[in-house]
Amino acid sequence: MQIVLVSGLSGSGKSIATAVLEDVGYYCVDNLPLAMLQPLVEYLKQEGYARVAIAIDARSGASFAQLPQIAENLRAQGADLRVIFLEAKTLSLVKRFSETRRRHPLSSDTVSLPEAIQLERETLADVAPLAHRIDTSDLSASALRLWIKDLVGPDRSRITLLFESFGFKHGIPLDADLVFDVRCLPNPHYVEELRPFTGRDPGVREFLEASPDAMALLADIRGFVENWLPCFIRDHRAYLTVAIGCTGGRHRSVYFAETLAAAFQAREQVLVRHRELS
């Protein structure tokens, strides 16, 4: 049985994720108390369900500390289990709740919205380390739908490598597993004729490929990922997010993400995301 657990912060896109999973053929259960997870899986397995998506949220309470053991038990019973954790920056979540005029499930007359968001982060702290984390702060609903489809669509027996470019001035992605800083390299932004372009364009690529430092750093990052990827696979990781950052997230980091993705494309399942270009 294939099982996808969807969790995360309220307002981060859990309902969108479960809707996508339902569209691609998963039987979906929403807001399930964690204590009911194993009994439900056993029942659905007996009934012949092959693909199940279950959404769990902070209203399950203190029982989240039990999730690592529950996940281990399900895998020991033969379940192909993946956990997706959706999150976003507090300012993004506050803006979304303000726009929709919905009330946060943990807020009250004595608990403000930012306090409720922080309380939810703390409540779900045991879930995030088990999961593939997706930072939806800068993702549109349509982009998140495509993202979820990509994550559940490939062959589940192989790890999926995600190479993500970003700009440090906008913050490090919350969902990054490995972070590499390429700000030490020559910056095409200061070459007037290259400034309007991105790391996908030939002129920027040629500029960086003419730099011995850029080529040496690219080789080092590729070698690091190649050397340690087997360790992540042995740890039963379904996804590995490799984030590469420069100052603005448009030139150097984009080139590195594109080039690394191309290098691994033939051997692994690869996705590319350019946060500041989306």
From Swiss-Prot:
The keyword Ligase does not apply. Keywords: ATP-binding, GTP-binding, Nucleotide-binding. It comes from the Bacteria. GTP binds at residues 57-60. One of its GO terms (molecular function) is ATP binding. Pfam families: PapZ_C, RapZ-like_N. ATP binds at residues 8-15. Transmembrane segments: none annotated. InterPro entries: P-loop_NTPase, RapZ-like, RapZ-like_N, RapZ_C. Belongs to the RapZ-like family. Displays ATPase and GTPase activities. This is Nucleotide-binding protein Tbd_0529. It comes from Thiobacillus denitrificans (strain ATCC 25259 / T1). The lineage of its organism: Bacteria, Pseudomonadati, Pseudomonadota, Betaproteobacteria, Nitrosomonadales.
